[in-house]
Amino acid sequence: SKGIIEKCMETNPKAMVGYGPDGGYPEGFGYWGYGTSFQVMLIAALESAFGTDNGLSQAPGFKKSARFMQYMTAPSGDCFCFSDSPVEAECNMMMFWFAGKEKDLSLLWIERQYLDRPDMQFAEDRLLPSLMVFCSQLDLNRIGKPKKNFWFNRGDTPVFIYRGGWDSKKDTYLGVKGGSPSTSHAHMDAGSFIFERDGVRWAMDLGMQSYITLESKGVDLWNMSQNGQRWEVFRLSNVAHNTLTINGERHLVESNAPITRTFESKKQKGAEV
């Protein structure tokens, strides 16, 4: 076991590079929940057993990524579903760990809404028991709403978010992303956006398609080369996204679209890609 732990401490930092430099998670909402749950459980186990995580939680952008995750949920309750993410957002138990770690209960503003909904069920979440541990020192009656309405991260998948508020399903929401189709689990969606207002998602992303529905039909889903079959799947292609398509051609897999400018004033809100 000593050798396994030592090997883990040596190699795990390589997996945490994706959170840098400022908290954006390149694979989007769905895989933040998947990958970060394992990362948090590792850190929590190390801290419980040894009193330290040897600096893993200090990796650039890691703790900031909880705020990224929060901004990914729109006022409608659905998420900004770029890359292989489902449209439906869900409660993530790891957010409670981050709230305790950062001593910032505002990180739980949206998670609390999930807990208060009588139609939400969590029994199938394999990490549900961790909620009791992570919440043991938190006063969930003192959760305040976030203070900011803008999010912007750089990194492999730059993302800009504007929320008109945190109180109503009718609040305005704009999500813009850059990046590259070559990123893990990416779609050809660089330059795309979603937009909500008055409780309606006026500009949408179709989100991921179930892997089993494609792989069971023999689709070579993980060939991400320029001519790979992955890009024949409609909802993964650029023509299915709110972005530019020229002469019906695919985006270049090896291309990259940075967010070069953001607008965060009362008169102008948005991003240039």
Regions found by a protein language model. Name each.
Residues G23-Y31, N54-S57, E232:
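Conserved aromatic-histidine-acidic binding/catalytic patches
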Residues S1-G30, L131-K147:
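Active-site lining segments of carbohydrate-active enzymes
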Residues S1-E10, I246, E254-T262, K269-G270:
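Active-site cradle of extracellular carbohydrate-active enzymes
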